[in-house]
Amino acid sequence: MNIKNTGKIFAVLGGLTALTVLSSEIFYDFSINTKSPIHMSKLNNLVQKATNTSGSEEEASAKYSGLTGTPEMKKWYAEHGEDVYITSDSLRLHGKKFKNDGSKYVIVCHGYTSKAKHMAGFVNKFHSFGYNVLAVDARAHGDSEGTKIGMGWPDRFDVIEWIKLILSWDANAQIILHGVSMGAATVLMASGEVLPKNVKAVIADCGYTSEWDEFRLEAKNLHIPWFPVLNAASVLSKLRDGYDFKQASALEQVKKSSIPTLFIHGTEDELVPYCMLDELYTAANCEKECLTVKGAGHALSSSVAPELYWNTVENFIAKYITE
């Protein structure tokens, strides 16, 4: 091999390396960095395509009414919530507290790029069951501080801080953790940590197995070759945030959990594939139940089959909560 050909090979390799680094930076900013100009603008189109929710805001609101709530529920949410705050990982995080009688509590965790107020339907329903409800804005969402979306991994420790806040209000609190999408992954990741005995059950609605698995699917949706872009973006996450995409694993956390868990998933979920339900359910070593909602897309189980959804939830938590 002559020097000229060797130079060409190194030039090609250098170009490929530079392209990989640039692509990984773009992928990281698009997926995680909320301050990036490419984050929100591209994300909305991806979510609409994956969940088939393109159209007017009214149409989307009606489709997700089980999650976001009716206009009356949204009004009730706005009028009755009390702002509360914690500090976790040097970030000031925001939540809304909805008081009720007794010592039953539920922490409600929203999904990717959403916010607590978009969970008004769930908040209202749990409150009608007699629960004190704490709806929280995840880091880098809503009124919480932060610029990096944690995909549930650092957020699991934020949940523990919210639990501590509840226990400062009520030492006898019986606590349910409920999450949808990224919120489901968050509560599953939290369940693998050592939690106070006050935490009685977990409800995970359409949670993903790991950040790696979910971003690999996202790369596919964006027609990006996941290798080596995802690998490089994962290294960036390790350098900047202290963990890589494979570390952020709900699948590994549920193996350590002893908290009774209800797994919920729609069969037509394309954003977090239905097959992830089987993986999570099989891996969990705790008491567990599973609800499959036929025909439901991502985060739509409560909208498609509200009676089935809430009867299942109510019957499940009744096993672990004392009146």
Model-derived segments and their meaning:
Residues 304-323:
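Catalytic active-site module of serine/aspartate enzymes centered on a nucleophile-bearing elbow/loop
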